[in-house]
Structures are given as structure tokens and as C-alpha cells.
């Protein structure tokens, strides 16, 4: 998103599953919005979701939890890394390969939690109009969902 250069223009762009939270500072977030605006036709729409502090804290109330599914289990660990102002999430996936055999995969990623005020500032600074802002709790936990319109 930070470096995307698309020659085509689109009527709408969708960015879900809190992908914007992976942008680790304000400059990256603003640059991504500018790139998305360039890829939209005039009056085009940008739909995205993003986590806020309350939402990520509700996802990790104990900072560790296990998720047991039919063919895999996941152990999630969460911590807030104050010195870098990012949330660190570690996930250990145990994928069933045979009847009693599992293969382990580990992943660590960082998420930046942006305030609603900062999101609104980026929207304004990059030439979008806020059409709606709602909470969606139906897919993969609670997320703020924004619908923007490109204005010129």
C-alpha cells in the first residue's frame, strides 16, 4: 500500500482484515491513503476496516489465548511494546498433517493502533470524504469500518 503504483483507476477499493494496522506510522498510513486515492476514479469509494485500542484489547483480554479448530490449533500471544508504540502478536499454528501428527508454524507481527481522531485527520488530509463509520462484529471480531469517497 505504501509503494503501490497502479496505472488503472477503479470505482472502488476494499482493504479488509485490519490491513491498515500493519502500517507502522502516520507517514506510511498517509502515503497509503494518497496512493489509494490516485488509484480511484473521481467520486470513487474506499472501504476499509481497522482496529482501535478497545477492539484489540477485547480480542486479547488475557494477552494469551488458544483457538482449537478441526484441523489446526493456534496459540495467540499479545503484548503492547511501549518503546515502539506497537502491538506485538505472536501466533503458533499447529496444522494437522496426519492422524496424530501436527506441524508447527510460528509467526510474529506488529500492529499500529491509530486513534479515531488520527484516522479522521488522514481522511481530511488526503482528499476523502467520510460517508460512514460503523462497527462490524460479524467477521473475525470487532472492527471499525469506514466508507470514504474520493473528492477533488
Predicted regions and their residues:
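SAM-dependent methyltransferase
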Residues: 47-118
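A short, glycine/Asx- and small/polar-enriched loop/turn
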Residues: 10, 85-87, 141-144
